[in-house]
């Protein structure tokens, strides 16, 4: 299901009971409340230059990283497999973890750190998605960055009947949905002449795997170390365990537990920002729930634009203060890049004029301005420019280094702050040297 709008992505349903209809009307009412509370819906269509990161180079410098992606609605043409109603302009979100792998013999979505050497980590990761179809899991996992985003398409190949079928066949061979059960209400929409397994993979393509076949995406990377990736893996496995054991049944909810809650809270587990609780009272959740495109902007700002030159501002940010004192880490750091990719073209299966909205205040809102800035200023999308920017920021901080005249905890914070900045300055300068060396070798 696509976030925000709550529009289903299954076949047209048979007649429902009065009880089910009333339940759906209540769900619709909750969504209307949310829309009223967040009145501005802006920038529906893809408006960003296509950007790409050199995966081999990036992973050689940052073998462990998380990548949050806000992805558009999809619009499937009729006559190709199951006729799906489609999502809505609120879109969907997915989460890629480089350096984490699916445990292949678990028979259920379970993660572990990859065994690969950090030097061979390019594309070695797992993509996660949340879907309202699921009954016994919160998320599913797709092995490999290339397949998670691009399916089984060859370089330069469009989406056609052959590549569409090939991608589903490969997904089945990988066992992406092994051990996963769908809600009966979803399975009841299955065409009579289709097996449940084929149906599950058909309605999951371009939402839970092979995202680029049908959707535009805007992605934000968060460099991590092995320890932080391990924390995220443990968090995600623990999140799924009650559904795996049968203690709980998963029920997606646009306001209280949508696709973006998973990614937000996984990043909160390592200190990127505050946790966003699930299952809050509806009147509270309706005015504060994650919207995929908003989350993309929020994450890019958190990892690039915190006032790191102002230690007092960092001290007043509780999450940043705790991160720095306990971990020696500031979430705004080098290497946190954005990437924009439109849906694959040519495309015989899906229309590619797609929407993905912000929710924002219509007069005083700033999301559009902030989004535009990300794709105008090279430091957000180009690795060398990003690293040079942080090197300059760190140099300026250290040049003005002055400890406050205090003996309280703020003084301890200041000392830790300058130590961290000095360490990060040395690291980013070393990374720039490695990047320059890599570019020189590539040019030969």
Model-assigned labels for residue ranges:
Residues 145-196, 200, 210-214:
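Active-site acidic/histidine clusters and adjacent loop/turn architecture
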Residues 42-57, 180-444:
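Activation targets extended, charge/polar-rich intrinsically disordered C-terminal tails
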Residues 16-29:
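Bacterial N-terminal signal peptides that target proteins for export
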Residues 44-168:
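Intrinsically disordered, low-complexity N-terminal segments that are enriched in acidic
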Residues 34, 87, 256-259:
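Active-site-proximal structural scaffolding
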Residues 28-39:
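Bacterial N-terminal signal peptides
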């Amino acid at each position: 299901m696509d976030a925000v709008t709550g529009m289903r992505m299954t076949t047209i349903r048979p007649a429902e009971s009065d009880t089910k209809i009333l339940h759906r009307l209540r769900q619709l009412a909750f969504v209307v409340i949310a829309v009223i509370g967040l009145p501005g819906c802006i920038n529906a269509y893809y408006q960003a230059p296509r950007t790409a990161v050199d995966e081999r180079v990036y992973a050689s410098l940052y073998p462990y990283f998380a990548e949050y992606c806000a992805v558009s609605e999809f619009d499937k043409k009729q006559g190709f497999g199951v006729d799906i109603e489609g999502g809505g302009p609120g879109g969907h979100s997915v989460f890629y973890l480089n350096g984490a792998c699916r445990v292949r013999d678990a028979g259920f979505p379970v993660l572990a750190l990859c065994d690969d050497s950090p030097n061979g980590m390019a594309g070695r990761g797992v993509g996660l998605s949340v879907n309202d179809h699921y009954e016994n899991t919160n998320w599913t996992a797709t092995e490999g960055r290339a397949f998670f985003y691009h399916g089984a398409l060859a370089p330069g190949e469009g989406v056609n009947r052959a590549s569409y079928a090939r991608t589903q066949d490969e997904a089945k061979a990988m066992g992406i949905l092994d051990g996963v059960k769908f809600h009966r209400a979803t399975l009841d929409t299955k065409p009579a002449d289709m097996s449940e397994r084929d149906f599950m993979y058909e309605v999951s393509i371009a939402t839970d795997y092979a995202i680029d076949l049908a959707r535009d995406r805007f992605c934000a990377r968060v460099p991590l170390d092995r320890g932080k990736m391990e924390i995220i893996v443990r968090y995600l496995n623990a999140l799924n365990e009650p559904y795996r054991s049968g203690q709980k049944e998963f029920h997606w909810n646009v306001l209280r537990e949508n696709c973006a809650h998973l990614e937000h809270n996984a990043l909160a587990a390592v200190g990127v920002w505050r946790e966003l609780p699930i299952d809050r009272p509806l009147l509270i959740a309706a005015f504060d729930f994650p919207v995929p495109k908003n989350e993309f902007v929020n994450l890019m700002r958190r990892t690039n634009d915190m006032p790191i030159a102002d230690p007092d501002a960092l001290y007043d940010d509780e999450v940043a203060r705790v991160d720095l004192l306990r971990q020696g880490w500031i979430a705004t750091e080098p290497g946190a890049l954005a990437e924009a990719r439109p849906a694959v073209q040519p495309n015989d299966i899906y229309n590619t004029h797609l929407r993905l909205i912000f929710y924002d205040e219509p007069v005083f809102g700033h999301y559009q301005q902030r989004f535009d800035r990300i794709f105008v200023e090279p430091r957000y999308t180009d690795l060398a420019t990003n690293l040079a920017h942080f090197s300059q920021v760190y140099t300026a901080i250290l040049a003005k280094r002055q400890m406050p005249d205090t003996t309280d905890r703020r003084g301890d914070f200041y000392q830790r702050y300058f130590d961290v900045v000095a360490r990060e300055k040395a690291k980013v300068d070393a990374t720039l040297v490695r990047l320059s060396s890599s570019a020189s070798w590539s040019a030969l």
